[in-house]
Amino acid sequence: MRKHIKNNVSWVGKIDWELQEFHGSDYSINNGSSQNAYLIEEEKTVLIDTVWKPHSTEFIDNLASEIDLNKIDFIVCNHGEVDHRGSLPALMEKIPNTPIYCTENAVKSLVGQYHHPELNFKTVKTGDSVDIGNGKSLVFVEMRMLHWPDSMATYMTGDNILFSNDAFGQHFAVEELWADKADQCRLWAEAMKYYANILNPFSPLVKAKVEEIQKLNLPIDIIATSHGAIWRENPLQIVEKYYEWSQAYQEDQITVVYDTMWDGTKKLAHKIADEIAKQSPDTRVKIFNISKTNKNDIMTEVFKSKAIAVGSPTVGNSVISSVAGWLDFLRELKFKNKKAAVFGTYGWSGESTKVLREELTKYGFSVVEPEIKCNWNPDADDFGKAEELVKALLA
């Protein structure tokens, strides 16, 4: 169960190969995940984080097989969300007086979720530290809104390990634990998906926090995340990526998304994609039916894109329900510095393109003037409008 990290630091978490969704069903998981917890055994014994409640019995039994639980001097709670803290109530039944180091906001979230205000909470803020012996300390750094107000990271001096909690992680099961041992294509794809769907709304805070960490000039040999692979070879590569991603990131890509009732909007979507490829052969084009593709995977492609084109038929004087739900998720992610175009079909009233234009404008997209609004099934004149629409997107 224990896996060696460095010197007297071990991983004691859970690799969850069968996990398929997260945050309820709001985040899709394609390659498993892990809940990473760590055990430090210096002059003081410290547990950093726990695992999700469904694995609590296994976690506590495995931990008890490694050490006497009563020898744990204190627990560090970097974040109060249940995937990191679900095993805490059961663990505290066995060691009820053990101090728990966390932020003031984490006390609120832990008490609110588990209703145990009597626990021995020790609140910390950025710059506070605890001596763990052998010339080493744990230094705490608040990471507010990365991605909860209660979040923090913990830095271990001497071994130069940053226990980064939800920052710099991925939902990705890696049996060997290490990022350099993982499939690199999947690793970076999952890291970007995680950022795009969870952290992108907080990009200004990410940028500021990365700059703060860089100014501290701390030697960092390992970034021990709370999910997925742990970074040891050039660990700052993921920090540098976060800094890049936090600044209205885009590639030379346009993503076309739509849903359709009787294939009219689908035909327009594919015509627009073909026209992009014709006018700008080097631009990567992706096309997705919103009702047939996972929303998190689509949003990762939107994150990478410099522009999007969104299409819907008119239904009930608005857009089709799948597009309406997708737009609401798009709103949450707060993308910046991206263009958009709208298109759609209708039989009678034809409001879908108007609704799309209004919503995308509200969400910060620069919506180009040309659009395709097609009555019934598209004909040659409708398809011909794709040329001007694409020119405007590429301008």
Where do the model's predicted regions map?
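Terminal amphipathic helices with adjacent charged low-complexity linkers/tails
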Residues: 225-251
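Short acidic active-site motifs
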Residues: 87, 293-298
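FMN-binding flavodoxin-like domain, especially the glycine-rich phosphate-binding loop
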Residues: 174-177, 184-223, 227-230, 271-286, ...
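Active-site-proximal loop/helix segment associated with metal-binding centers of metalloenzymes
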Residues: 147-151, 159, 167-200, 246-250
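Metallo-beta-lactamase
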Residues: 3-7, 102-151, 208-209
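Active-site neighborhood of phospho(di)ester-bond hydrolases with catalytic His/Asp-centered motifs
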Residues: 48-50, 72-80, 100-103, 162-165, ...
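Active-site metal-binding motif and surrounding structural segment of the metallo-beta-lactamase
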Residues: 54-101
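Conserved beta-strand hairpin/beta-sheet module of binuclear metal-dependent hydrolase folds
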Residues: 2-65, 153-156, 160-164, 265
